[in-house]
Amino acid sequence: VIDELRPARTTDAGTMGEILYRFQQDTDWMPKLYTGAELIASAGAMIDRGWVTVAVIDGRVQGFIARDGEEICALYLADGINRRGVGRKLLIAIRDGCDRLHLRSFEANEWANRFYLRQGFTE
């Protein structure tokens, strides 16, 4: 159960970077291009731009979505959070006031691509 969906705070950058780093390391097809520190800095930059909404579960950030205008720049969940409706709720939260959204996803990310199709996105 999600405690809250809220705008990300500067103090969330570390947890967001950890989620990104874990995904990068645990996903076979994902290029291992960035250090944990670089991913924390990237998360901080998205937060500073006001792009990020986080999902808090049990008092901890367990997922986030970043939107720049009509583009979804990132949607990541912590390990073990998939298939609980968190990604869908994050998408719903950022759709307010936006008639059109687009995103890019790795072709190899089959699970995410199926998720986006179920949410009404097209290829």
Placement of each model-derived feature along the sequence:
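Conserved N-terminal entry element of GNAT/NAT acetyltransferase domains
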Residues: 1-11
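Conserved GNAT-fold acetyl-CoA-binding loop/helix
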Residues: 13, 17-44
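Conserved GNAT acetyl-CoA-binding A-motif
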Residues: 96-108
